[in-house]
Amino acid sequence: MNLRDKLDVYLRLARMDRPIGTLLLLWPCLMALLLAAGGMPDLKVLTIFIFGVVVMRACGCIINDYADRDLDAHVDRTKSRPLASGEVTGREALILFAVMGLFAFGLVLMLNPLVVKLSVVGIILTIIYPFTKRFTNMPQMFLGVVWSWSIPMAYAAQTGEVPAEAWWLFAANWCWTVAYDTMYAMVDREDDLKVGIKSTAILFGKYDRQIIGLFQLAALACFITAGWAADRGLVYGLGIITFVGFSMYQQKLIHERERAPCFKAFLNNNWAGLSLFIALGVDYLI
């Protein structure tokens, strides 16, 4: 394998060819920076967090695939991943994870000590998450914490503290993550049952759609409260209404629990997050 082919494999291992995860991480992080800064985040902080989201999402994908390398080969959707297919060795994956993790930590060192401390917790959570699928039926709930951790970090970077209002956005994103990652887990439910991977899609069973709906409602309530705490106005409210519309569309897609529509519902959450972020940004502008 030549250098160009090897680089392509590493990029696929880091999921650089599939940006959906990065985008789902990015929108709430940017919202946190906007709210923490009153609409005008520091350019240095903004740049560091954008790069940090990209790199840490890649780290999460690498360590996830390393943990699942023996299981992914038995799942249709994941059997072609570089580790599962043998294109990359476990040692190579760990080295790449370490290099990218150190790069991300280097970015954080340019910020204040509180952010550095929170980042250490974040990397530990990132490493633990893939293994939660072995011993709990609720890995999506743990993932919700991991994927929301940039929110208190963003507040800490911008203000030097993590105020109470930050946790409303954290709670909103946690509920939203559980909802959309359960949709994602519905795609693999049959394969996961065969190989012993646990998920909320399996745990919720025939009540999956209803429970996803409850998490969507809880996310909505917390997003509203976060906006209220920051004294947001009409445009943010329109963003909330748009978010509701996307959530209803996702419920329609997962109604029959078929793989392709469930995956489409998962992907649709990118537009839900983007619309809410844009609404928040415009609300500050006017």
From Swiss-Prot:
Pathway noted in the entry: Cofactor biosynthesis; ubiquinone biosynthesis
E.C. no: 2.5.1.39
Name under which the protein is recorded: 4-hydroxybenzoate octaprenyltransferase
Bilayer topology annotation: Multi-pass membrane protein
Molecular functions (GO terms): 4-hydroxybenzoate polyprenyltransferase activity
Any Gene Ontology biological process: ubiquinone biosynthetic process
Cofactor or coenzyme needed: Mg(2+)
Organism: Shewanella sediminis (strain HAW-EB3)
Cellular-component GO terms for this entry: plasma membrane
Keywords: Cell inner membrane, Cell membrane, Magnesium, Membrane, Transferase, Transmembrane, Transmembrane helix, Ubiquinone biosynthesis
Compartments where located: Cell inner membrane
Top-level taxon: Bacteria
PROSITE patterns: UBIA
EC main group: transferase
Family: Belongs to the UbiA prenyltransferase family.
Function: Catalyzes the prenylation of para-hydroxybenzoate (PHB) with an all-trans polyprenyl group. Mediates the second step in the final reaction sequence of ubiquinone-8 (UQ-8) biosynthesis, which is the condensation of the polyisoprenoid side chain with PHB, generating the first membrane-bound Q intermediate 3-octaprenyl-4-hydroxybenzoate.
Principal place of residence: membrane
Cross-referenced PANTHER family: 4-HYDROXYBENZOATE POLYPRENYLTRANSFERASE, MITOCHONDRIAL, PRENYLTRANSFERASES
Substrates-to-products reaction catalysed: all-trans-octaprenyl diphosphate + 4-hydroxybenzoate = 4-hydroxy-3-(all-trans-octaprenyl)benzoate + diphosphate
